[in-house]
Curated annotation (Swiss-Prot):
EC number: 6.1.1.17
Gene Ontology CC entries for this record: cytosol
Matching PANTHER family: GLUTAMATE--TRNA LIGASE, GLUTAMATE--TRNA LIGASE, MITOCHONDRIAL-RELATED
Keyword rRNA processing attached: no
Major localization class: cytoplasm
Any one GO molecular-function label of the UniProt entry: zinc ion binding
CDD domains: GluRS_core
Organism of provenance: Pectobacterium atrosepticum (strain SCRI 1043 / ATCC BAA-672) (Erwinia carotovora subsp. atroseptica)
Protein name according to UniProt: Glutamate--tRNA ligase
Keyword ATP-binding on entry: yes
Subunit structure and binding partners: Monomer.
C-alpha cells in the first residue's frame, strides 16, 4: 500500500507553530515510508479565508522546505464534486433534507440545555414524508447510525470509542447550497487516497462523524493520529505572548529553518536522548509510535540554543544566504566590507539569531557617527593616545593584510610599550568599531580593512586630542 498523508490548513490566518509541526509530522511520516505528501487548502469558510493567508501558508511551507507531491488542492474548486456526492446520498437514503427553522433549532437547544442534556439535533426531519416546495429553504443532513459505536485505533493515543447515540445528524450542505467542512474533508481524503490523517487533537471529535460518512459511502477509512497541543512554558494555551507567531515571523526574527524544524520535531517526539537532528535523520528515525500523548511546552530559550548551534555548525556560505535577507532589511551595502560568509564566522559565537548578527555588524560596512559613550569614556582616554599612535604606525606598514600580521602589530605595540595586550587592544577595538564589544580585535580589524581601520584610528586620536584640551 502506498502511504499518503496530507496537510490541510484553513487559510484564515498565518501558519503558526502548531500547524507547522503538524505539517512536519505528516511530511516526515510520508518521507520515512517513501510515500506521498499532499497539500490541501481547506477554504470553505468563504468569509474568513484570504489570499494573504494562503500566501503565508505557502511561504512558510517553502521556507521550511516541506515540499509536497500533490496540490495545492483548493476545496472551493471542488464544490461540484461534493454536491454530486451529496445528491447521490440523498437518492440512496444516507442523507436527508432538513427543513427545521432556525427558531425551532434554537428552542430545541434551550430545552436540552435546561435539562442538562448535550445539545444535539433530535432527528425531527429524519424519515419525514411531508411535502415541501423545491425552493423551500433547507439543509442536508447525514443519516448517522443510531446503534453501536465508532471505534478507531489512534496511532498516537490508542483505541478511541464514540457511541453513535452521542453523534447527531451532521449538516453536510448548508441552506445556501455550500457543502460543510466535515463533509468536504471526507470526500477529499477519499478522492486523494489519503492513508494516514495526522492532525491536531482538536479534531478528535470530528473523527467518528467522518468515519461514519466514509462507511456510508463504501470508502476506505484512513488511519488517524491526533497530535497533542502545544502549551506555553507556563502551562497555559500557547499565545503570542509565548511565541505563537506565524512561521515567517521566525524567519524575520533571525531563525534558520533547520533550527525551527529541529525544535518542532522534538516538541512531542523523541529518539533516545538525541537533541540535534538533521533533516535526513528526522526522515530516517521518525515514527508515530514515539510521539507523546501529553501536551508539549514551547520554550523560546531552547529554540535560541538550537539556532545558535545551527548558525555555527552549518556551512558559513549557506548561513550567509539566509543572513543576506536580514542585511537587506538593515539597509546595509555589503560591497565595501567582508563577505557575509566571513561575517558568519566572525559573529556566529556571539549571536543567537541572524537578526542579531545583522544588527551588530553595521561597523563592518558603515562608518559610525560617534563612539559609544561608555566605551569611549573608559578606553579613549589620554593614556590611550600613545598605544593607538604606535599601533596605527605598525598597521599602516603591513603589506600583507592578514589577521596574523595584525595580531603581531598589536602584540609588538604592547611589547614595545611594556604593556598588556588589553591596554592596546581595547582602545583599538573602540577606535575601529565605535563600541566596547566585538569579535577578536585582530580579526575585526582585518575584516574592516586597512584604510578604513586607519581612518577610524585617526578619528579616535582626534577624539582623544579634543578630550585632552578639555581637561
Amino acid at each position: 500500500m502506498k502511504i499518503k498523508t496530507r496537510f490541510a490548513p484553513s487559510p484564515t490566518g498565518y501558519l503558526h507553530v502548531g500547524g507547522a509541526r503538524t505539517a512536519l509530522y505528516s511530511w516526515l511520516f510520508a518521507r520515512h515510508q517513501d510515500g506521498e505528501f499532499v497539500l490541501r487548502i481547506e477554504d470553505t469558510d468563504l468569509e474568513r479565508s484570504t489570499q494573504d493567508a494562503i500566501d503565508a501558508i505557502m511561504d512558510g511551507m517553502n521556507w521550511l522546505s516541506l515540499n509536497w507531491d500533490e496540490g495545492p488542492y483548493y476545496q472551493t474548486k471542488r464544490f461540484d464534486r461534493y454536491n454530486a456526492v451529496i445528491d447521490q446520498m440523498l437518492e440512496n437514503g444516507t442523507a436527508y433534507k432538513c427543513y427545521c427553522s432556525k427558531e425551532r433549532l434554537e428552542a430545541l437547544r434551550e430545552q436540552q440545555m435546561e435539562k442538562g442534556d448535550k445539545p444535539r439535533y433530535d432527528g425531527h426531519c429524519r424519515g419525514s414524508h411531508e411535502h415541501h416546495a423545491d425552493n423551500e429553504p433547507h439543509v442536508v443532513r447525514f443519516l448517522n447510525p443510531q446503534e453501536g459505536s465508532v471505534i478507531f485505533n489512534d496511532r498516537i493515543r490508542g483505541p478511541i470509542e464514540f457511541s453513535n447515540q452521542e453523534l447527531d445528524d451532521l449538516i453536510i450542505r448548508r441552506t445556501d447550497g455550500s457543502p460543510t467542512y466535515n463533509f468536504c474533508v471526507v470526500i477529499d481524503d477519499w478522492d486523494m487516497e489519503i492513508t494516514h490523517v495526522i492532525r491536531g487533537e482538536d479534531h478528535i471529535n470530528n473523527t467518528p462523524r467522518q468515519i461514519n460518512i466514509l462507511k456510508a459511502l463504501g470508502a476506505p477509512v484512513p488511519e488517524y493520529a491526533h497530535v497533542s497541543m502545544i502549551l506555553g512554558d507556563d502551562g497555559k494555551k500557547l499565545s503570542k505572548r509565548h511565541g505563537a507567531v506565524g512561521v515567517m515571523q521566525y524567519r524575520d526574527d533571525g531563525y534558520l529553518p533547520e533550527a525551527l524544524l529541529n525544535y518542532l520535531v522534538r516538541l512531542g517526539w523523541s529518539s533516545g536522548d538525541q537533541e540535534i537532528f538533521s533533516i535526513d535523520e528526522m526522515k530516517s528515525l521518525f515514527s508515530l509510535d514515539a510521539v507523546n500523548k501529553s501536551a508539549s511546552a514551547f520554550n523560546t530559550e531552547k529554540l535560541q540554543w538550537l539556532n545558535h548551534h545551527y548558525i555555527n555548525h552549518l556551512p558559513a556560505e549557506y548561513v550567509a544566504t539566509h543572513l543576506s535577507w536580514h542585511i537587506e532589511q538593515a539597509g546595509l551595502d555589503t560591497r565595501t566590507g567582508p563577505q557575509l560568509s566571513e561575517l558568519v564566522g566572525l559573529l556566529g559565537e556571539r549571536c543567537k539569531t541572524l537578526k542579531e548578527m545583522a544588527d551588530s555588524c553595521r561597523y563592518f560596512y558603515e562608518d559610525f557617527a560617534e563612539f559609544d559613550a561608555d566605551a569611549a569614556k573608559k578606553h579613549l582616554r589620554p593614556v590611550a593616545r600613545q598605544p593607538l599612535e604606535l599601533v596605527r604606525e605598525k598597521l599602516a606598514a603591513i603589506t600583507s593584510w592578514t589577521a596574523e600580521n595584525i595580531h603581531h602589530a598589536i602584540q609588538g605595540t604592547a611589547d614595545e610599550l611594556g604593556q598588556g595586550m588589553g591596554k592596546v587592544g581595547m582602545p583599538l577595538r573602540v577606535a575601529v568599531t565605535g563600541a566596547g564589544q566585538s569579535p577578536g580585535v585582530d580579526v575585526t580589524v582585518h575584516a574592516i580593512g586597512q584604510q578604513r581601520s586607519l581612518a577610524r584610528i585617526d578619528k579616535a586620536l582626534a577624539f582623544i586630542a579634543e578630550r585632552e584640551t578639555q581637561q
